[in-house]
Swiss-Prot record:
Subunit structure: Homodimer.
Summary of the function given for this chain in its UniProt record: Catalyzes the attachment of proline to tRNA(Pro) in a two-step reaction: proline is first activated by ATP to form Pro-AMP and then transferred to the acceptor end of tRNA(Pro). As ProRS can inadvertently accommodate and process non-cognate amino acids such as alanine and cysteine, to avoid such errors it has two additional distinct editing activities against alanine. One activity is designated as 'pretransfer' editing and involves the tRNA(Pro)-independent hydrolysis of activated Ala-AMP.
InterPro entries assigned to the protein according to its UniProt record, in alphabetical order: aa-tRNA-synt_IIb (IPR002314), aa-tRNA-synth_II (IPR006195), aa-tRNA-synth_II/BPL/LPL (IPR045864), Anticodon-bd (IPR004154), Anticodon-bd_dom_sf (IPR036621), Pro-tRNA-ligase_IIa (IPR002316), Pro-tRNA-synth_IIa_bac-type (IPR004500), Pro-tRNA-Synthase_IIa_type1 (IPR023717)
Keywords in alphabetical order: Aminoacyl-tRNA synthetase, ATP-binding, Cytoplasm, Ligase, Nucleotide-binding, Protein biosynthesis
Keyword hit for tRNA processing: no
Protein name: Proline--tRNA ligase
EC primary class: ligase
Catalytic activity: tRNA(Pro) + L-proline + ATP = L-prolyl-tRNA(Pro) + AMP + diphosphate
Higher taxonomy: Bacteria, Pseudomonadati, Campylobacterota, Epsilonproteobacteria, Campylobacterales
GO CC, any one term: cytosol
Free-text comment on this protein's domains from its UniProt entry: Consists of three domains: the N-terminal catalytic domain, the editing domain and the C-terminal anticodon-binding domain.
Enzyme Commission numbers on file: 6.1.1.15
Gene name linked to the record: proS
Species assigned in the record: Helicobacter pylori (strain ATCC 700392 / 26695)
Length: 577
């Protein structure tokens, strides 16, 4: 490719609204062009990188037995009604009508679509297992699209679905796909982790995320420093903590506690640790057709994990869609006073009460007395009947690993893949069944597997690039080598550049010849910005010495290469990175 023919509209400055370096570099280097909020055009350089990512993905998925298909981007809303997700998914699901007044959705995920395919064409256990996948455009109407391709509304996704006759078969495919994903991300040259995760709106019994470690990541993962335990902070667990020594032993009594509304101030008032204070957190619960209130109790030195809290509610049948902060008006309406909420008589004020599992059989506790400026001491939870306990706290870095007692540490990360065990939920709601070996009708066990193809462009750059521009990995750079001529008006330099260009092409090197009549500094700036893996410099000294200067984009390290060794050395350098 000649640079003069390459459509790469570079910018002098990155967009003003770009925050992450990946967004800045992709826009400034002419990879992407924004056409609307969270919607981007992929220009030739980006398309080359996308193609490489997709080719690696196709290769590994098919090696692991998956078959490539292409499903409709537009899906009947009636399918989403059958699965129950039309209302549950929320406003991120874009619903529209055609000219005949039929309702459709632009797919953010395709569980309904693929399940309908299976229901129509897989009739016998003899056809199982089946794993089908696609790479296609998706749309999620994000309320706040940001960070370029990291949180876009329109994006490219590899999503796959598997169908099985039993849970054992699903377990095998879950691990098989996990292996495929590990190979894909390793081929892409990424430093990543596999972590336990929440299943979210997709549902299912078990899920794992594949996250790329980067300080600019949206997510926080909790990693053990001693073993391989790793989990998204939304579901991370910890070992039971040892109880502090100064236990505030007391008979049940009510004490005046003026202006002590925080767990810390209550602990200081009673000269004890926040560990022994019951912290009450009231949330407004949003259901499909109503709103209720829930109260969650944790120890005073813990914080509520909202995802865990929502899941705990749904386990007890709340059918909650989301949680929101309860306003002062919400509390006033039910007669609760912030800072003084406790378990005594609370059932008449809220619809749901859940205690963190660390409080099970807890005694010697201090809690709000449900009366302004009063707290109760000597609270013993064993005296209450039918309390609901669940893991609802957010793990802290001071906590210990649930597997080995090792220290837990936070890491910022960016999710690039997610695999789920869906079970029979979608199959039952969409009546997708088959006949087993005994001729009995059974519902499919399903798996779901996704990789954010377009998001991977940002993930690679967030982990690998520098302040100058794009740094790609071995298998993702748009070009292997750019040939930069110091003085394009020098016919001898120009002639040598074309000769070298042809020599590299013959060796299978994806080379870009910068044939522009531009300043040498400007050409090198574009090399740093675009991120070809190597820059081969041709100047007056090259003609005299028969030696080339070669620069690695990854670290800007320079190396001198003799003309007679050119192809051999270039291939070695490309293979080594």
């Amino acid at each position: 490719m000649l640079f003069s023919k390459l459509f790469a509209p570079t910018l002098k400055e990155p967009p003003k609204d770009a925050v992450l370096k990946s967004h800045k570099h992709l826009a400034q280097a002419g990879y992407i062009y924004q056409v609307g909020s969270g919607i981007y055009n992929f220009l030739p350089l980006a398309k080359k990188v996308l193609d490489k990512i997709e080719n690696i993905t196709h290769k590994r998925m098919q090696e692991h037995g998956a078959q490539n298909i292409l499903m409709s981007f537009v899906v009947l809303a009636s399918l989403w009604e059958k699965s129950g997700r039309l209302d549950k998914y929320g406003k991120e699901l874009l619903v529209f009508k055609d000219r005949k007044d039929n309702d459709f959705v632009l797919s953010p995920t395709l569980e309904e679509n693929i399940t309908e395919i299976a229901a129509n064409f897989i009739k016998s256990y003899k056809q199982l297992p089946v794993h089908l996948y696609q790479i296609h455009t998706k749309f999620r109407d994000e309320i706040r699209p940001r960070f370029g391709l990291v949180r876009a509304r329109e994006f490219i996704m590899k999503d796959g679905y598997s169908f099985h006759e039993d849970a054992e078969s699903l377990d095998k495919e879950f691990l098989n796909t996990q292996s495929a994903y590990k190979e894909i991300l390793s081929d892409l040259g990424l430093d990543f982790r596999i972590v336990e995760a929440d299943s979210g709106a997709i549902g299912g019994s078990k899920s794992r995320e594949f996250v790329v470690l980067t300080e600019c990541g949206e997510d926080t993962i909790v990693v053990c420093q001693n073993c391989d335990y790793a989990a998204n902070i939304e579901i991370a667990k910890r070992s039971k903590r040892p109880e502090p020594l100064n236990v505030p032993k007391a008979q049940l009594a009510k004490f005046p506690t003026p202006n002590t509304t925080s767990a810390q101030s209550v602990a200081e008032f009673f000269k004890t640790e926040p560990y022994f204070v019951l912290k009450a957190l009231v949330r407004k619960v949003i259901h499909k057709d109503k709103e209720t209130l829930a109260c969650f109790f944790v120890r005073g030195d813990d914080n509520l994990e909202e995802v865990k809290a929502l899941n705990a509610l749904n386990i007890i049948g709340a059918n909650a869609l989301e949680l929101r902060e309860a306003s002062q008006k919400d509390l006033d309406n039910v007669g609760l006073i912030a800072g003084f909420i406790g378990p005594y008589g609370l059932k008449k004020h809220v619809s749901y009460i859940i205690f963190d599992e660390d409080l099970k059989e807890g005694d010697c506790l201090i809690a709000g007395a449900n009366e302004k400026d009063f707290h109760a001491v000597g609270v013993d939870l064993k005296g209450f009947e039918n309390l609901v306990y669940a893991d609802i706290v957010q793990v802290k870095e001071s906590d210990r690993c649930p597997n080995c007692q090792g220290a837990l540490k936070y890491h910022k990360s960016l999710e690039v893949g997610h695999i789920f065990k869906l079970g029979q939920g979608y199959a039952k709601s969409l009546k997708a069944s088959f006949l087993d070996k005994n001729g009995k009708e059974q519902f499919f066990e399903m798996g779901c597997y996704g990789i954010g193809i377009s998001r991977l462009l940002s993930a690679i750059l967030e982990q690998k690039s520098d302040d100058l521009g794009c740094v790609w990995t071995k298998n993702t750079a748009p070009f292997d080598v750019v040939i930069v001529v110091s003085n394009w008006k020098d016919e001898a330099q120009k002639k040598l550049a074309f000769e070298v260009y042809e020599r590299l092409l013959q060796k299978g090197v994806d080379a870009l010849l910068d044939d522009r009549d531009a300043r040498f500094g400007a050409k090198m700036r574009d090399f740093e910005l675009i991120g070809e893996r190597l820059a081969l410099i041709i100047g007056k000294q090259t003609l005299e010495s028969k030696e080339f200067e070669c620069i690695k984009r990854a670290n800007l390290e320079k190396q001198t290469i003799k003309d007679i060794e050119l192809e051999e050395k270039i291939l070695e350098m490309l293979e080594s990175e």
